[in-house]
Amino acid sequence: MYNNSMKLLFLSSLMMGTYLSISSTPWLGTWMGLEINLLSIIPMLTDNKNSMINEPAIKYFIIQSMASTMLLISILIIQMKYMMWWDNKNIPSMMIMSSMMMKMGAAPFHFWLPEVMSSTSWINCLMLMTWQKIAPMMTMSYCIKMSSFLFVVIMMGIIVGAMGGLNQTSLRQILAYSSISHLGWMISSMTISENTWEFYFLIYSTLNVIIIFMFKTMNLFFLNQIYSASYFKTEIKFMMMTSLLSLGGLPPMLGFLPKWIVMQSLIDNKMTALVLLMITFTTITLYYYMRISFSAIIMLHNENSWLTSIKMNKLVVALPILSMISTMGLICTSNFMLLLSS
């Protein structure tokens, strides 16, 4: 573990790499930003005291290196295309999108994400699910266009996210599969407009911050810990439930609003079949969130020793505020309907 000054250095370098990647005009500058970002997060995933914790950092480095190599090959093909007057524009764009999906952990390049997240801390999980997706998604948005390839990618993301989380007991892996499902929605929103996916990503990141703050503060890592947490008052469990259901997209909570905008936009663009399939499999994702939430409230057990280290003072102050943010969809949805009708 590094001291605060080293953490600040790596975090600053991480942010600089992301900003360089999304603001660069040439492809080489984008690649350089992604590499700075990678080299900055690797030390944050490692721990000098425990060599077993370094395993996710090694896995992450290997996958990101493969994706960077694919991006470099794509850039080379683009340069050769201009030199050789090559007319096939789909191959380099598909390679760039594939490399960015590998970096984000989107299906069908998702296999590393649940494994890495299950072995790292909650803060690192939050970074992998939010900040580390910004540069690849911005890069992917430069060359995205709805096609059969993209249709398959969107559906695979939503199906894998729905089915993969059903039999999981680790909260970190459940959030990883939820992230894969949300990536399917965000990729579909990229085909509509830049503002749509950015709004979706903002809401998604906000809800992830809320949920991970709860899990980190309450020292929760597995489902059985939630079920046996009779130490928590029913009000605290209810606030946790509202945040989880909001992330799942239950109407009329905040997490449903970006999904509604994406669905409405896709229907306007004559993609009704895609919307129906997305809704069907997202319902499965919502099911295991509801299963967690209602089981946590209904099931009561004796107090466990691991609960004594929880700092309840933080929860008493923060959870009502965070729960209120999760239910802001009630206000936002009504305002959105007024905008649609005007």
Curated annotation (Swiss-Prot):
* The enzyme's E.C. designation: 7.1.1.2
The positions making up the signal sequence are none
**What GO biological process terms does the UniProt entry carry, in alphabetical order?**
mitochondrial electron transport, NADH to ubiquinone
Compartments it resides in = Mitochondrion inner membrane
* Topological relation to the membrane, as annotated: Multi-pass membrane protein
Q: Which molecular function GO terms apply here?
A: NADH dehydrogenase (ubiquinone) activity
Q: Which residues cross the membrane?
A: 25-45, 58-78, 94-114, 146-166, 174-194, 195-215, 238-258, 274-294, 316-336
GO cellular component assignments: mitochondrial inner membrane
| Catalysed reactions listed for this entry | a ubiquinone + NADH + 5 H(+)(in) = a ubiquinol + NAD(+) + 4 H(+)(out)
Q: Which coarse location class applies to the principal site listed for this UniProt protein?
A: mitochondrion
One Pfam family hit: Proton_antipo_M
Q: Which UniProt keywords apply?
A: Electron transport, Membrane, Mitochondrion, Mitochondrion inner membrane, NAD, Respiratory chain, Translocase, Transmembrane, Transmembrane helix, Transport, Ubiquinone
What is the similarity comment for this entry? Belongs to the complex I subunit 2 family.
Describe the function of this protein.
Answer: Core subunit of the mitochondrial membrane respiratory chain NADH dehydrogenase (Complex I) that is believed to belong to the minimal assembly required for catalysis. Complex I functions in the transfer of electrons from NADH to the respiratory chain. The immediate electron acceptor for the enzyme is believed to be ubiquinone.
Q: Please identify the protein, giving its name as recorded.
A: NADH-ubiquinone oxidoreductase chain 2
